[in-house]
């Protein structure tokens, strides 16, 4: 039962947190574990915070089944900070890195990486971003330092499903910011897996970086210490003051995921939620339109237009206004693409998704002239 005044929050990030997590945070805000202080007041060097940090690492390893040859780091700077940290840490003796550009975030990552390493795109990106070109047409180079991809493009609603791209014998680097723990993850061929916590795993300010051990120690001389994987590992993510409140929040979210049955159970719920919305789109006779190739539709960010492929601004404004009247917020699409975007992260329930589905059906009956 939702607390009074709570909205159904479909924001793309920062996003909804499970209510159980928020209530636990409220309960412990003044007095964490009977220590007489809040977590955000504790010394990051204290044994109590050290225990919390190590427990959080263990929960990530357990839930994602992270292999023993990977380290788990807590960093800052968001996913965007990792756009620079990746080439700074992984360049080694290599001259270039390969990038798969399928949307706004992988495009930004390639642009940022170009400051620190030569970037080669395995195919020429074409706009609008609606699909992932067939891999047999990609141009790979086994001399690349790594092959980078964004597992889920939040802005455009494109997700690598059900598996990662072929690595072609170089380490895969995955930005999983917007589908972190939304489904089971296969670490095969991966060298680095990273993401900001603010969509599926907690609050803004914490970046989780999972690094294969054999890739550590290849950082460029200009790498800032706070972005150095080697420094962070040597100091158990305590090289400088970490986002203590963010780590605490993620700890609670991880326990919530575990209580729900783990990643497979969460994945099945996410399939149910996204399927509910995509079914309405596909059966609307064009009233709702999702341009994304069905093979790569995101289960996290459902992007669509109303009134045809290019959208009808008047209809979309009416839809958003009606959504707010029905206690739903943050359904407006990203400013660069427009339309509607329903972000169905782990904390969004099936029941909340059903409220959106009901409104979509009602709205179509009111305004469909076909």
UniProtKB/Swiss-Prot annotation:
Segments crossing the lipid bilayer: none
N6-(pyridoxal phosphate)lysine-modified residues are 199
UniProt-listed PROSITE patterns: AA_TRANSFER_CLASS_5
Q: Which UniProt keywords apply?
A: Amino-acid biosynthesis, Aminotransferase, Pyridoxal phosphate, Serine biosynthesis, Transferase
Report the top EC class in one word: transferase
Q: Does the keyword Magnesium apply?
A: no
Q: Name one GO biological process term.
A: L-serine biosynthetic process
Catalytic activity reads: O-phospho-L-serine + 2-oxoglutarate = 3-phosphooxypyruvate + L-glutamate; 4-(phosphooxy)-L-threonine + 2-oxoglutarate = (R)-3-hydroxy-2-oxo-4-phosphooxybutanoate + L-glutamate
Pathway annotation from the record: Amino-acid biosynthesis; L-serine biosynthesis; L-serine from 3-phospho-D-glycerate: step 2/3; Cofactor biosynthesis; pyridoxine 5'-phosphate biosynthesis; pyridoxine 5'-phosphate from D-erythrose 4-phosphate: step 3/5
| Needed co-factor(s) | pyridoxal 5'-phosphate
EC number(s) stated in the UniProt entry for this protein: 2.6.1.52
In which domain of life is the source organism classified? Eukaryota
Which InterPro entries does the entry link to?
Aminotrans_V_dom, Aminotrans_V_PyrdxlP_BS, Pser_aminoTfrase, PyrdxlP-dep_Trfase, PyrdxlP-dep_Trfase_major, PyrdxlP-dep_Trfase_small
What SUPFAM superfamilies does the record point to?
A: PLP-dependent transferases
How is the co-factor bound, per the entry? Answer: Binds 1 pyridoxal phosphate per subunit.
Residue sites binding L-glutamate per the record? 45
Q: Which residues bind pyridoxal 5'-phosphate?
A: 79-80, 105, 154, 175, 198, 240-241
Concerning Pfam families, the annotation shows: Aminotran_5
A Gene Ontology cellular component where this protein is annotated is: cytoplasm
Q: Which GO terms describe its molecular function?
A: O-phospho-L-serine:2-oxoglutarate aminotransferase activity; pyridoxal phosphate binding
Described function: Catalyzes the reversible conversion of 3-phosphohydroxypyruvate to phosphoserine and of 3-hydroxy-2-oxo-4-phosphonooxybutanoate to phosphohydroxythreonine.
- Protein family per UniProt: Belongs to the class-V pyridoxal-phosphate-dependent aminotransferase family. SerC subfamily.
Assembly, in brief, is: Homodimer.
Q: What is this protein called?
A: Probable phosphoserine aminotransferase
